[in-house]
Amino acid sequence: MAEFVRNLAEKAPALVNAAVTYSKPRLATFWYYAKVELVPPTPAEIPTAIQSLKKIINSAKTGSFKQLTVKEALLNGLVATEVWMWFYVGEIIGKRGIIGYDV
């Protein structure tokens, strides 16, 4: 057991250095996209979002959504699933747990 700990202690700096070297460019890429994609909408973008929502509601009323191609329907489903999952991530963060609320 002592030999295992000694070997681990000897290899730890090299492992940490390799992990940092591997992670640094990926973390930079993540921060770039996080700053660009995760910003809240500006006041100028809100009317566009409302207009888009009105178009979706109108297509549901008139039945024009039946004219979508398979690719468009699949992409719309993926976007809806992404929004739904981000809602659940927010719920998990808010609850500070995966299951249930502390009552």
UniProtKB/Swiss-Prot annotation:
- Which terms does the UniProt entry file under GO BP? proton motive force-driven ATP synthesis
Primary localization: mitochondrion
Q: Which residues are annotated with the PTM N-acetylalanine?
A: A2
Check the record and name the InterPro entries matching this protein: ATP_synth_F0_gsu_mt, ATP_synth_su_G_mt_met
Q: Does the keyword DNA damage apply?
A: no
Keyword flag Transport: yes
Which parts of the sequence carry N6-acetyllysine?
A: K11, K24, K35, K54
Write one Gene Ontology MF term.
proton transmembrane transporter activity
Q: Which domain of life is it from?
A: Eukaryota
Looking up Pfam families in the UniProt record yields:
ATP-synt_G
Assigned keywords, A-Z = Acetylation, ATP synthesis, CF(0), Hydrogen ion transport, Ion transport, Membrane, Mitochondrion, Mitochondrion inner membrane, Transport
User: Cellular location of this protein?
Assistant: Mitochondrion; Mitochondrion inner membrane
A single GO CC term for this protein reads: mitochondrial inner membrane
Q: How does it assemble?
A: Component of the ATP synthase complex composed at least of ATP5F1A/subunit alpha, ATP5F1B/subunit beta, ATP5MC1/subunit c (homooctomer), MT-ATP6/subunit a, MT-ATP8/subunit 8, ATP5ME/subunit e, ATP5MF/subunit f, ATP5MG/subunit g, ATP5MK/subunit k, ATP5MJ/subunit j, ATP5F1C/subunit gamma, ATP5F1D/subunit delta, ATP5F1E/subunit epsilon, ATP5PF/subunit F6, ATP5PB/subunit b, ATP5PD/subunit d, ATP5PO/subunit OSCP.
Q: What does this protein do?
A: Subunit g, of the mitochondrial membrane ATP synthase complex (F(1)F(0) ATP synthase or Complex V) that produces ATP from ADP in the presence of a proton gradient across the membrane which is generated by electron transport complexes of the respiratory chain. ATP synthase complex consist of a soluble F(1) head domain - the catalytic core - and a membrane F(1) domain - the membrane proton channel. These two domains are linked by a central stalk rotating inside the F(1) region and a stationary peripheral stalk.
Q: What family does the database annotate?
A: Belongs to the ATPase g subunit family.
Q: What is this protein called?
A: ATP synthase F(0) complex subunit g, mitochondrial
What organism is recorded for this protein?
Bos taurus (Bovine)
